Swiss-Prot record:
Basic and acidic residues bias spans: 302-311, 396-412, 430-452, 504-513, 633-647
Comp. bias intervals (Acidic residues): 413-429
Domain of life of the native organism: Eukaryota
UniProt name for this protein: Protein OS-9
Domain MRH: 108-230
Function of the protein: Lectin component of the HRD1 complex, which functions in endoplasmic reticulum (ER) quality control and ER-associated degradation (ERAD). Specifically recognizes and binds improperly folded glycoproteins as well as hyperglycosylated proteins, retain them in the ER, and transfers them to the ubiquitination machinery and promote their degradation. Possible targets include TRPV4 as well as hyperglycosylated HSP90B1.
Glycosylated sites: 177
One cellular component term from this protein's GO annotations in UniProt: Hrd1p ubiquitin ligase complex
GO molecular function: carbohydrate binding; glycosylation-dependent protein binding; protease binding
Major subcellular site: endoplasmic reticulum
SUPFAM superfamilies cross-referenced by the UniProt entry: Mannose 6-phosphate receptor domain
Processing after translation: Intramolecular disulfide bonds. Isoform 1 and isoform 2 are N-glycosylated.
Native organism: Homo sapiens
Length: 667
């Protein structure tokens, strides 16, 4: 094939380059088998051309492809200096010989390996047996593959000449005169090869494989850490392939035309960048001066500003109520510009700040919310005193009646109003959180949205704790109220907090968002989604993400499971499904991936489930679990694709460049 032919010619030129300087100086050249055994070469055809005939270096060779495209290939420096580096190795080995290193295996237990029907038993220095096992018992005849005869002698000068054992780095023993073979009538025989395995541990001898290259002639490969101290059997350090870099070689006029085209494209790109930079200050100046675009989705600027102000006001004042203790439904508000102006007349300064505030990141949005909360708290009294003031201002006709009535009548009226408020309490909470979710939907990424939810949740908890403390003071200023009344009030506030937190954690369904746009009223319960079935192809891949945190010596293990509505979980499921479909893989059963890292400071709710680095590496982790080494194979396929594309390219005059025939080309 074309690539093999090109690589073979390059290797031939490489050997010629190694031999030629020695022959010119009167030396004797030789083919270095050790170099071919221990060095690996890889060819890289680069897309960047060079001007031909400019390099006079001795390590550059000229080759031509099947499409008549010429290349200048530079040999790696490791190939030139390989022999000199080998001569500068460590001094001769002074430790025990190979037979002495293996002698402890004589007293060790025999090694066993089961392959298909047969079980093989190797006893060092004695024999090799083959038999069938059932229920830990030998069934049938026991065959002898051979008895110990001899071992390879590393001190024999004749044996050294073969170089076979040294190149492949193994020690061998010969076993013969075994049971008679039914196929050829000769006794069975076997060769046992011992290789170093540094990862096997102490006494980690094992039979790696059993082969039968010829009838009744066997080869057993045994890996052991006992041979690793010997330099002749220690595996060489793994090294990346030595790259042979090949650049397309162009004629001077072709190369100058290529350089001119590159310069023109660079000038065009620089011109576009300059135009964008010139437009940048104009855009930002319009934003800072408060100039809004004319097209605002069919709505007037006053109306949009009113909506923004209402939304932020709802976020910062969730306890504000309308006259009579009832909240004004969203659909009953006057949507006209005049009504919007009158409704937002008080916080005009706040509204102007919103117009000129530039939100560049989720962190800016969070800081902005905190500023709004702080400013609102400074400009109004505490929550415990706010409601009576509003009632006094909005319902002046009821105040005389309350003053004239007795305290019991007043308490009854307040209880009736509280009951009316409770009916719309859940609906108002869902409406508030729904508006908040809808505003953030187009601003934040899924990961940033989760972090913002957790921070808003923590802020709500702090606010409601203050409410509970103030309520306790109002209910029992002198310590005379009953304990049951105080507990009942705290229970009601805690229930409200739990509802808000639960709604904050849940993600609204698309049907719920459409309801918001039409009526701006959220139903009490979203319709339950149909349970996925195993036959549904969309739900054949299910991912569960669980976070475990080990506490102190007196604390239990904290277990948190990611909700199905979390967008990050949907992203992970899509990633796994795409990977399985593309590679044609099946994950039978369950696959468990553990990511261990130091626990970040903060609460469990505030900490992120997966970091950005974990999400990026999850694909590679999952790929390597299903198919060990498959990720490297995918990278190699991509490299091979680029290599073929560069090899097919035929350089020529401007506009005359083309590619080779895709059908006849094959790597």
């Amino acid at each position: 094939m074309a690539a093999e032919t090109l690589l073979s010619s390059l290797l031939g030129l490489l050997l010629l380059g190694l031999l030629l300087p020695a022959s010119l100086t009167g030396g004797v050249g030789s083919l270095n088998l050790e170099e071919l055994s221990e060095m690996r070469y890889g060819i890289e055809i680069l897309p960047l051309p060079v001007m031909g005939g400019q390099s006079q270096s001795s390590d550059v060779v000229i080759v031509s492809s099947k499409y008549k495209q010429r290349y200048e290939c530079r040999l790696p420096a490791g190939a030139i200096h390989f022999q000199r580096e080998r001569e500068e190795e460590t001094p001769a080995y002074q430790g025990p010989g190979i037979p002495e290193l293996l002698s402890p295996m004589r007293d060790a237990p025999c090694l066993l390996k089961t392959k298909d029907w047969w079980t093989y038993e190797f006893c060092y220095g004695r024999h090799i047996q083959q038999y069938h096992m059932e229920d830990s018992e030998i069934k049938g005849e026991v065959l002898y593959l051979g008895y110990y005869q001899s071992a390879f002698d590393w001190d024999d000068e004749t044996a050294k000449a073969s170089k076979q054992h040294r190149l492949k780095r193994y020690h061998s023993q010969t076993y013969g005169n075994g049971s008679k073979c039914d196929l050829n009538g000769r006794p069975r025989e076997a060769e046992v090869r011992f290789l170093c395995d540094e990862g096997a541990g102490i006494s980690g001898d094992y039979i790696d494989r059993v082969d039968e290259p010829l009838s009744c002639s066997y080869v057993l490969t045994i890996r052991t850490p006992r041979l690793c101290p010997h330099p002749l059997l220690r595996p060489p350090p793994s090294a990346a392939p030595q790259a042979i870099l090949c650049h397309p070689s162009l004629q001077p006029e072709e190369y100058m035309a290529y350089v001119q085209r590159q310069a023109d494209s660079k000038q065009y790109g620089d011109k576009i960048i300059e135009e964008l930079q010139d437009l940048g200050p104009q855009v930002w100046s319009e934003t800072k001066s408060g100039v809004a675009p004319q097209k605002m989705a069919g709505a007037s600027p006053t109306k949009d500003d009113s909506k923004d102000s209402d939304f932020w006001k709802m976020l910062n004042e969730p306890e504000d109520q309308a006259p009579g203790g009832e909240e004004v439904p969203a659909e009953e508000q006057d949507p006209s510009p005049e009504a919007a102006d009158s409704a937002s007349g008080a916080p005009n300064d706040f509204q102007n700040n919103v117009q000129v505030k530039v939100i560049r990141s989720p962190a800016d949005l969070i800081r902005f919310i905190e500023e709004l909360k702080g400013g609102t708290k400074k400009g109004k009294p505490n929550i415990g005193q706010e409601q009576p003031v509003d009632d006094a201002a909005e319902v002046p006709q009821r105040e005389p009646e309350k003053e004239r009535g007795d305290p019991e009548r007043q308490r009854e009226m307040e209880e009736e109003e509280d009951e009316d408020e409770d009916e719309d309490e859940d609906e108002d909470e869902r409406q508030l959180l729904g508006e908040f979710e809808k505003e953030l939907e187009g601003i934040l990424l899924p990961s940033d949205r989760d972090r913002l939810r957790s921070e808003v949740k923590a802020g709500m908890e702090r606010e409601l704790e203050n409410i509970i403390q103030e309520t306790e003071k109002e209910l029992d200023p002198d310590g005379l109220k009953k304990e049951s009344e105080r507990d009942r009030a705290m229970l009601a506030l805690t229930s409200t907090l739990n509802k808000l937190i639960k709604r904050l954690e849940e993600k609204q369904s698309p049907e719920l968002v459409k309801k918001h746009k039409k009526k701006r009223v959220v139903p009490k319960k979203p319709p339950p989604s149909p349970q996925p079935t195993e036959e549904d192809p969309e739900h054949r891949v299910r991912v569960r993400v669980t976070k475990l945190r080990l506490g102190g010596p007196n604390q239990d293990l904290t277990v948190l499971e990611m909700k199905r509505e979390n967008p990050q979980l949907k992203q992970i499921e899509g990633l796994v499904k795409e990977l399985l479909e593309r590679e044609g893989l099946t994950a039978a059963g369950k696959i468990e991936i553990k990511i261990v890292r130091p626990w970040a400071e903060g609460t469990e709710e505030g900490a992120r489930w997966l970091t950005d680095e974990d999400t990026r590496n999850l694909k590679e982790i999952f790929f390597n679990i299903l198919v060990p080494g498959a990720e490297e194979a995918q990278k190699e396929r991509q490299r091979q694709k680029e290599l073929e594309s560069n090899y097919r390219r035929v350089w020529g005059s401007p506009g005359g460049e083309g590619t080779g025939d895709l059908d006849e080309f094959d790597f």
